[in-house]
């Protein structure tokens, strides 16, 4: 799958995948700076499933040692942005 064209597109796709893992979450109320577990019921199995969804959705390998970077929307977007080169300004 192609990398998102912008940071906004990346965020929209991540929130869509998050909703698939945690369907009871209203993704419009997710606060980017707070860890998911502080905002809603999100346990270690959810983190694993979220990492798997991100892998499938973006085609990015996410080693288990990097799962801690997926614990908030802000850190997840930063991690994926580095992996995908998304949201970088053009020349």
Question: Where on the chain are the PLM-derived regions?
Answer:
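Phosphopantetheine-dependent thiolation modules in NRPS/PKS and related acyl-activating systems
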Residues: 2-42, 49-51, 56-91
């Amino acid at each position: 799958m192609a990398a998102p064209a912008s940071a906004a597109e990346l965020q929209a796709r991540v929130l869509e995948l998050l909703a698939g893992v945690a369907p009871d979450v209203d993704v419009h109320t997710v606060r980017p700076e707070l860890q998911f577990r502080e905002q809603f019921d999100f346990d270690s199995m959810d983190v694993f499933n979220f990492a798997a969804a991100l892998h499938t959705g973006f085609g990015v390998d996410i080693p288990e040692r990097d799962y801690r970077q997926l614990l908030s929307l802000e850190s997840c977007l930063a991690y994926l942005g580095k992996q995908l080169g998304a949201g970088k300004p053009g020349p």
